[in-house]
Design a protein with these regions (language model features):
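Bacterial Sec-dependent N-terminal signal peptides
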Residues: 1-26
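Ankyrin-repeat boundary/"N-cap" motif
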Residues: 21-31, 52-65, 86-98, 121-133, ...
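Conserved ankyrin/ankyrin-like repeat signature
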Residues: 39, 72-73, 106-107, 138-142, ...
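Ankyrin repeat domain, specifically the short helix-to-loop turn at the C-terminus of the second helix
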Residues: 41-49, 75-84, 109-117, 144-153, ...
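Long, acidic/polar, low-complexity amphipathic helices and coiled-coil-like
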Residues: 107-201
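Acidic, serine/threonine- and glycine-rich low-complexity intrinsically disordered segments
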Residues: 170-257
């Protein structure tokens, strides 16, 4: 009994015991508070690891970027050991992917100057440019930068064979991005591996003005794809942040889809 008691006490006071404080630098709320360098340094001095990855492979730099901390703070974090510019984080993405996601072109340029690779593909099959497109980035300067640094707008496609114009289609609000990508050489009638064109992808976003615009441009919208799917099916997918309402399906039905 005495031996069992000693073992229990050893476990109770072990640094791995459940009562141990977690790394505050992995707490997203901490980065929402926009901490100062002094606050960050204090946390590090108190034993919080500035380069630790959580169970989903996000680290303090990721959270600082995603919570819109000043670039000077982010640069400071990147300067710390273990936070190399090409460090692999969630979904095999490096910091420049998260900068792209947050429309943070100055940070993207800084990371590039530090040696950030521009030709990586994440674990879901998205290049840097296509990650920007599939997350709805509308700032063409982001894409200009990617193209300037070697991205191939006509050949970079995701695992489904979708180009950046198709990927961004659910998020477009007018013809700006359509004109932008077609001016770079993408054919508005391009399709993915299953034969889905821009109308199907736009249906995910449910913007009737955009779909009308595409119809007026002469794109196909009633046809079935190679697996007998159509715009109605794509509308049911919605996007990560929104689902289509009944009005979208009534609109598509009125088109004969």
């Amino acid at each position: 009994n005495q031996l069992i008691y000693i073992i229990f006490l050893s476990f109770l006071f072990s640094k791995n015991y459940i009562g141990q404080e977690k790394n505050i630098l992995l707490n997203r709320d901490f980065w929402r508070s926009q901490p100062s360098i002094e606050k960050i340094d204090s946390c590090i001095i108190n034993g919080n690891d500035v380069s630790e990855l959580n169970e989903y492979a996000f680290d303090p730099v990721c959270w600082a970027i995603l919570e819109n901390n000043p670039n000077e703070i982010i640069k400071y974090l990147i300067s710390k050991e273990g936070n190399g510019v090409n460090k692999i984080t969630h979904d095999s993405r490096t910091y420049i992917f998260w900068a792209m996601y947050k429309d943070n072109l100055p940070l993207m340029k800084y990371l590039y100057e530090l040696g950030a690779k521009m030709d990586l593909v994440d674990s879901h099959g998205y290049s840097l440019m296509n990650f920007g497109a599939v997350t709805g980035q509308k700032n063409t300067a982001l894409y200009d930068f990617c193209i300037e640094k070697g991205s191939k707008v006509n050949t970079e496609k995701n695992n489904d064979g979708a180009n950046p114009l198709l990927l961004v289609a659910p998020f477009i609000e007018d013809e700006t991005l359509i004109n932008y990508f077609t001016s770079k050489g993408i054919d508005i009638n391009d399709v993915d591996n299953d034969g889905n064109g821009i109308f199907n992808y736009a249906a995910k976003g449910g913007n009737q003005n955009v779909m009308n615009l595409l119809i007026n441009k002469g794109v196909k919208y009633k046809n079935l794809n190679k697996i007998n799917g159509n715009a109605m099916i794509f509308a049911s997918y919605g996007t990560r942040s929104s689902k289509n309402k009944l009005s979208t399906y009534k609109y598509l039905d009125s088109l004969g889809i």
